[in-house]
């Protein structure tokens, strides 16, 4: 047996998971790192701290698993997407704080570019919308703020990358400046049809091509970890953004396969095969994976507030003492909030509405409304938002035949059943919780030649429990009608 080390670099912590060659977890290490909010709407990370915590958890996982680096088959990497790092090629040191995917500082720039008529080109080439969420305007902002940085970038002295590129550069001792197609597809700069950095979009944002990484297959070779870091040279063979890694880890490999990750927010993806299907309903078209030079695509929708709504009940309202109490409440109410609807538009609404001006509300309350109804309405809001995404996917011709789920919320059986009922779709929960890291490990195993093909991932996927829809169409229809009225109110000026 030769284990695989998956590095899972997230928004709030760096993690390392050691897998055996059959996909079972041998050891886990995790450490948080600091979040910085220097101005309203700004979110930054220290890229050097991200590197140091990643290296520390990699060493810790190996120690916990009793595995020496020379015995590893490969390293795989998965990462928070869109977060932007700019560093000096010669020293390997960041020249500015990393601008996190949540950062909104470039909202005005995006509006200006939209007014100039750039968005149709952005969508046509990248499958994305013109939004501060993506890397392109973040990188442009860094270069625009400092003429000296721009001059160094144009001279080829600086390197840009998303977190995967940054870690690869440091792990390989500066030998490799590369990313994979899934991460490149989130930059606002990469043409997902032709598989090249877009000259037109780079010009529109004044991005020097010299700073951009090489784009490789998701199961490609990304160099070797230098011996000084882990004790021996180890090949890096699998790289993917976190949501795409979870899609792969869930064995969603073909059209009709879909997954949704329920954490603080929610990310849903539906596999579209080799067709880059552009959404007519404000979903994102993104690269699901690139293998052997062939790109596979997915439609993606994101919900800003999922588990965060439950945290709000606990931390701000004090309605519950722990997230686990929601299961007890749902067991009592059977998912029926008695006509109460909560729209958790605390930061606007995500896909398919993309309405930054929407605001949270609760509607339908009476004197009979109590704690249980409020808690049920809050949890149900996650299922309703997912139904909005599913309907948009369906109208775009990408409705999944079933939905595989992961993330912190899915340990709650009552939520999973409510989700299946609301979606009118079978919902499957896997045995393995570490789906994102498992996807990176599977890509590494594939790249290293240990897996004969992607189908090995499907063969190793194990079901924990399936949830079948149990409500009648009339019940679901009535509930959805109430939800849509509530959303319309939340979006009213």
Predicted regions and their residues:
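Short, conserved phosphate/pyrophosphate- and ester-handling motifs at nucleotide-, phospho-/glycolipid
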Residues: 46, 103, 242
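Residues that line or immediately flank small-molecule/substrate-binding pockets and catalytic motifs
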Residues: 33, 79, 102, 219, ...
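Short beta-strand-loop/turn "lid" adjacent to the catalytic site in phosphate-handling enzymes
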Residues: 63-101, 126-135, 168-191, 216, ...
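A conserved helix-loop-beta module that forms one wall/lid of the active-site cleft
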Residues: 205-220
